[in-house]
Each structure stands twice: as C-alpha cells, then as structure tokens.
C-alpha cells in the first residue's frame, strides 16, 4: 500500500531529483517562466512557493536556507530583492501552471509554469517579441 507517500519519483534517484529541482527552481526564478513536463511543473511549484516565502522573510537565515536549496547566489539575490518585494502583499499562489500541449518526440504532456505577475523582460528578447505581438493582435481585434 502506498498510503501517505506523497510526491513523484519521476524515474530518477533521490539525488538526481534534488539536483533537478534545484536547477529548475533557479531557472524559474531567473527567467520567471519555463516550459517543462506537467508532472515536473506540479512538483516544482511547492518548492518555489516556499522559496518565495523565504524571500519575503528576508533575514540572513532565510537567505542561507534558500542558498542551500538552489545553490546560485545571483538567483537568490534576485529572489530576495525583486521577487519577494513584488509579492509582499500576496499570501501564497505566486505561480501558475498552464497546460501547453504535448511534446513532439514522446507525446509527453507539457506545461508552462510562470510567476503570476511576472516581469516580461526576464525571459529574453524572443518572449518580449511574442508578448508584444499578442498585445498588438488583441489591440487590432
């Protein structure tokens, strides 16, 4: 029986899962939006939500806890400076998961996970062009 066994193994060892989630959390905080498989998105969401809550706490111990989890000081400083101040008044629910079809090679369900009030410029020039094109299309319609 699997009573009380939460979380997905994602066909990886525990150390591989831990490293993958650390890398995914760092990428999500840096770019504020990533495309991944739906199960991975569902697993990374509570990890990043807890990191944002640590960022809102803002003290040295919280910063060290965040560094121990995602191991990238530049990303942690963005988390504590930019992202934590953006969500200072929001109590949870910092991320959204949107289904994004299926991957071409193996038909795996894809999802876009992003911050709710994300900074469009964080993703890069390609995303900025897409967002501006969508805005122009909505304006024309």
UniProtKB/Swiss-Prot annotation:
Pfam families: Ribosomal_L17. GO terms for molecular function: structural constituent of ribosome. GO terms for biological process: translation. The keyword Ribonucleoprotein applies. Keywords: Ribonucleoprotein, Ribosomal protein. SUPFAM superfamilies: Prokaryotic ribosomal protein L17. GO terms for cellular component: cytosolic large ribosomal subunit. InterPro entries: Ribosomal_bL17, Ribosomal_bL17_CS, Ribosomal_bL17_sf. The keyword S-adenosyl-L-methionine does not apply. It comes from the Bacteria. Part of the 50S ribosomal subunit. Contacts protein L32. Belongs to the bacterial ribosomal protein bL17 family. This is Large ribosomal subunit protein bL17. It comes from Rhizobium meliloti (strain 1021) (Ensifer meliloti).
